[in-house]
């Protein structure tokens, strides 16, 4: 197979990019020193996290000048995410660190007054030359496709400015802000989105770059769709609770208020519900059109050496065939390995990222960290798992999984915690409640409400909230809409609605009656009652913008 070189400086999930490159017929070779660059033909610069950190790494490693020389030589160069951002002059994220300066513009942070930041999800990358009569686009981009973005800073688009200098520009819109989603000129191609996480649409752009196929025509049908299909889609996430069953097999299971053991039928008497094999099910949901796949390791494999964790192999195998974001939760904490070695949470997360994860989800440890944060007078320690991982990989890499439950009171004055007036009073007629945080899979409650928790972890650097609800788990009665609006009002970071989905209508309700950024389903998919594709079609039929699954490249 022909080869392409990757610069081996970057933190994060490079495995998925390697798998995507292999998928489109190329092999990867690594650039491990600046001197290697002189012999490179095609170069890809991936990147995640902090602009200043990435540019500082490139500078201290002696790579900046060789990269400039590679670009100036006319040989193919592709930048991905921070790899794109590195081409600009500077960024608000770290004003004192200069970029490569290839593109005369500056990156700015998204305005969080009207929307969640980071911008996470599937959005457009539409060539600015396309209009209702058709046109051309570059490197396989399609105005009818969606691509996966995850970033807080972007290059604002100013019509015609870069085009005057010969740049081809594709844009996306987030709220009222239009920004550069992809850009190309001569031998340079760069994307703010992650092609390796953008399904077949992303694989198509990778192949076009590697094959040198810069321009192609857009069909009239695609150009007509451009305006009506532009913008961020409604994300549908498939979640797989993974654990070992009683005979040692790794299985996908599903609980009823977090109880995963059978209560009736042939397996009554406490057998762990076995709903399938994790890798096979993840691939199935990807092919149904899932926008993300989340693995929640609900036993954390406590007696297994860290390097041999079964979840690492699940991620490695899944990332070979699933080209959408993968999140892993469970066991992301400071731990002691079986040989007595102390392993920091950052090292645990790094193993998951190197195995194919894009995000890690932190649960009980986030509650303890929040308690310590308030006890210290809202002073950050810099030592929590959330802080250390987000500093190294960016806040978009850290999800906090929240497991609250309702506590009813007669009036708000009966508790120090933040309450809501609910439309669903309890049997005693109390119509006020607060949401109490729990740990250890819901088995232990803490004197902390859900708003306190999410605001604390946002301050620590979490980039997303996975909002479960113990009262709704396994109920198939719909999401807790009151809880979701309660939490959305408390933070600026994106929130994923979880717990309670039993039919497509529940997804319509949560997107219509809350401002949630995504919605997650589990049991209804595992049991085969509905597919992810059926949920998306239901939403699309009712006017919601969703990503359509595209067939294999």
UniProtKB/Swiss-Prot annotation:
The keyword Kinase does not apply. Pfam families: GATase, His_biosynth. The active site is at 81 (for gatase activity), 194 (for gatase activity), 196 (for gatase activity), 241, 403. Residues 3-223 form the Glutamine amidotransferase type-1 domain. Pathway: Amino-acid biosynthesis; L-histidine biosynthesis; L-histidine from 5-phospho-alpha-D-ribose 1-diphosphate: step 5/9. One of its GO terms (molecular function) is glutaminase activity. InterPro entries: Aldolase_TIM, Class_I_gatase-like, GATASE, His_biosynth, HisF, IGPS_HisA/HisF, IGPS_HisHF, Imidazole-glycPsynth_HisH. GO terms for biological process: L-histidine biosynthetic process. Keywords: Amino-acid biosynthesis, Glutamine amidotransferase, Histidine biosynthesis, Hydrolase, Lyase, Multifunctional enzyme. It catalyses: 5-[(5-phospho-1-deoxy-D-ribulos-1-ylimino)methylamino]-1-(5-phospho-beta-D-ribosyl)imidazole-4-carboxamide + L-glutamine = D-erythro-1-(imidazol-4-yl)glycerol 3-phosphate + 5-amino-1-(5-phospho-beta-D-ribosyl)imidazole-4-carboxamide + L-glutamate + H(+); L-glutamine + H2O = L-glutamate + NH4(+). It comes from the Eukaryota. Gene3D superfamilies: 3.40.50.880, Aldolase class I. Its EC number is 4.3.2.10, 3.5.1.2. The keyword Hydrolase applies. Residues 232-553 are annotated as: Cyclase. In the C-terminal section; belongs to the HisA/HisF family. IGPS catalyzes the conversion of PRFAR and glutamine to IGP, AICAR and glutamate. The glutaminase domain produces the ammonia necessary for the cyclase domain to produce IGP and AICAR from PRFAR. The ammonia is channeled to the active site of the cyclase domain. This is Imidazole glycerol phosphate synthase hisHF.
